[in-house]
């Protein structure tokens, strides 16, 4: 394992924090130190990108909001979030890396519903669209003073409210509960609650214990947490990819994803047995 040269990493971060150019040097060290983890993350990414490219034109010529093109866009959203998570993990910004996993799980929930009940999925997405549009227009209250813009906003809100009617958006908990098997809701809650939102637990990660039993606030990086962050990201993307593959009827996806998940499990076990490490 490569050790960092700086005796005190804070010196390199004193001026620009985690935007310091030094972090790019450390990034290569982290990737080398956790080579197997990052190779697995990229192997899954290559497969996921190939699925997206192969089915990018699904539903071409039909309505843009039909099930097939909607599913492709949902999967694209998951791919982008996965990319962000891996890039953050490469820089040992592990809290943020797991926080980026949340939309991957949400994409997986929607893809599973699109695969099992496309009519319901499209209706729920329509409800979500109009409810958020109403909420967005109501933000005008924070910016009073322009009567013309205010009037136009009221009209837009009324149009969306009429289309929304008495319908209410489904919660992620209810959506996940309606899906077959284990959609990964527990992992989603962990990614959302512990990492995605400011909480006492997430604040506890930003402190370094000193020799006098005190603590010192720090920004990071958190190298030893990289495997955990990558586990969250790979697990979420593998689930979501399985749902997308089922929707577009890719026959060999289960075998490929099962092999990737076996490697993920083996890496997790090896990391647990090795215990804390890193520079």
Stretches found by the model and what they are:
Residues 1-279:
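A cross-kingdom marker of C-terminal helix-rich interaction/assembly modules
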């Amino acid at each position: 394992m490569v050790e960092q040269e700086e005796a005190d990493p804070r010196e390199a971060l004193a001026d620009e924090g985690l935007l310091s150019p030094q972090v790019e040097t450390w990034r290569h060290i982290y990737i080398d130190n956790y080579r197997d983890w990052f190779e697995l993350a990229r192997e899954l990414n290559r497969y996921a990108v190939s699925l997206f490219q192969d089915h990018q034109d699904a539903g071409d010529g039909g309505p843009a909001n039909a099930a097939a093109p909607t599913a492709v866009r949902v999967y694209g959203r998951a791919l982008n979030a996965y990319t962000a998570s891996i890039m953050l993990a490469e820089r040992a910004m592990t809290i943020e890396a797991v926080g980026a996993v949340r939309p991957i799980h949400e994409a997986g929930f929607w893809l599973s519903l699109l695969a099992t009940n496309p009519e319901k999925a499209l209706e729920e997405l329509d409800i979500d669209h109009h409810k958020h549009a109403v909420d967005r227009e109501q933000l005008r209250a924070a910016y009073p003073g322009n009567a013309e813009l205010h009037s136009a906003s009221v009209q837009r809100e009324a149009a969306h409210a009429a289309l929304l009617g008495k319908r209410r958006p489904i919660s992620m908990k209810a959506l996940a509960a309606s899906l077959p098997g284990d959609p990964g809701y527990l992992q989603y809650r962990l990614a959302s609650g512990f990492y995605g939102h400011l909480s006492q637990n997430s604040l506890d990660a930003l402190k370094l214990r000193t020799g006098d039993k005190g603590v010192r606030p720090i920004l990071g990086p958190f190298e030893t947490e990289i495997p955990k962050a990558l586990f969250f990201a790979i697990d979420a993307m593998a689930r979501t990819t399985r749902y997308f593959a089922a929707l577009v009827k890719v026959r060999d996806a289960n075998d490929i994803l099962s092999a990737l998940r076996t490697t993920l499990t083996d890496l997790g076990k090896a990391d647990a047995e090795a215990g804390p490490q890193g520079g």
